[in-house]
């Protein structure tokens, strides 16, 4: 079965519904299966944005036309492969001049609705977080639910010479300091999502970050983003999580339809179709995204 056949199998049960109703549902299903996730990456210079993206994602890289906001450019890159793609947006502002606060706030108000999630990177050995805190509270104060904080370069946590390269893990002393760092970041920012510490260089805790990333993503973005993960990070657990998020998104397409269901369609009929579509979506998920 190819992706087109899989999508057709999801759509087939809709034939028992009135045309206008089935068309409405079909449009949402097609948007769902063709969604291109957009992930924002932000953090001060040296936080390791490129290293983390390379450790997490794969695909043919092509530049996307930059977004201009005042004198600022927001760089965007598309990662493509096997019929699916995602866009990474490099977000400016953190650690730059406060003279441009109004400009940055306008930029983020414009661009944040386009993003499925923002990864905010903070170096493990960065103790000067007042700039990050200011940006969080004054520039991005209305977009907190879309942000996942990541403590990067955990292998550089003191005492850095104790990092266990063979076991790819921190020493007990480093582990304690990493815990204290993530707890400090959480206390300072009070984010919606948990703070995750990783080492992109060694691969330590990247699987934990992927799990947090999938959970933080809107359900409609989880499966297409999963297709761009590095192979070793796309585990059965991650696939299972993405599959459930996808079927949940399919299920919710029917919520608005059912709430305004026209008299020509009995709710029992619509619910039967809904159950069938969701069941088929779960069954053919693998053919859509792999």
Q: Which residues does each PLM region occupy?
A:
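Conserved G1/Walker A P-loop phosphate-binding module
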Residues: 1-91, 287-289
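Alpha-helical scaffold elements adjacent to nucleotide-binding pockets in ATP/GTP-utilizing enzyme cores
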Residues: 55, 110, 114, 131-138, ...
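Canonical P-loop GTPase G-domain recognition
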Residues: 155-224
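Switch II of P-loop NTPase G domains
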Residues: 71-74, 91-141
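P-loop NTP-binding site
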Residues: 210-217, 231-290
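Short glycine-/polar-rich loops that comprise or flank the Walker A/P-loop
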Residues: 84, 113-118, 142-147, 190-194
């Amino acid at each position: 079965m190819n992706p087109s056949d899989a999508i057709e199998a999801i759509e087939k049960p809709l034939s028992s519904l009135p045309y206008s109703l089935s068309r409405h549902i079909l449009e949402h299903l097609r948007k769902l299966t063709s969604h291109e996730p957009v992930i924002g990456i932000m953090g001060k210079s040296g936080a390791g944005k490129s290293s983390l993206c390379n450790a997490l994602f794969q695909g043919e890289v092509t530049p996307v036309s930059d977004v201009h906001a005042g004198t600022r450019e927001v760089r965007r890159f598309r990662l493509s492969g096997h019929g699916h793609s995602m866009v990474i947006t490099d977000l400016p502002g953190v650690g730059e001049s406060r003279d441009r606060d109004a400009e940055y706030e306008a930029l983020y108000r414009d661009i944040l609705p386009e993003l499925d999630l923002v990864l905010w990177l903070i170096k493990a050995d960065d103790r000067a977080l007042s700039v990050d805190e200011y940006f969080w509270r004054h520039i991005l104060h209305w977009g907190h639910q879309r942000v996942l904080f990541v403590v990067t370069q955990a292998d550089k946590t003191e005492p850095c010479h104790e990092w266990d390269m063979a076991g790819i893990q921190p020493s007990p002393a480093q582990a304690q300091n990493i815990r204290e760092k993530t707890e400090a970041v959480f206390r300072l920012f009070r984010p919606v999502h948990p703070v995750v510490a990783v080492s992109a260089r060694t691969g330590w805790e990247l699987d934990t970050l992927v799990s947090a990333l999938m959970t933080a993503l809107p359900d409609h973005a989880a499966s297409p983003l999963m297709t761009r993960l590095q192979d070793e990070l796309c585990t059965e657990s991650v696939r299972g999580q993405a599959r459930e998020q996808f079927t949940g998104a399919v299920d919710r397409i029917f919520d608005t339809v059912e709430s305004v269901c026209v008299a020509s369609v009995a709710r029992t009929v619509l619910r039967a179709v809904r159950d069938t579509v969701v069941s088929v979506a779960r069954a053919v998920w693998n053919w859509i995204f792999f």
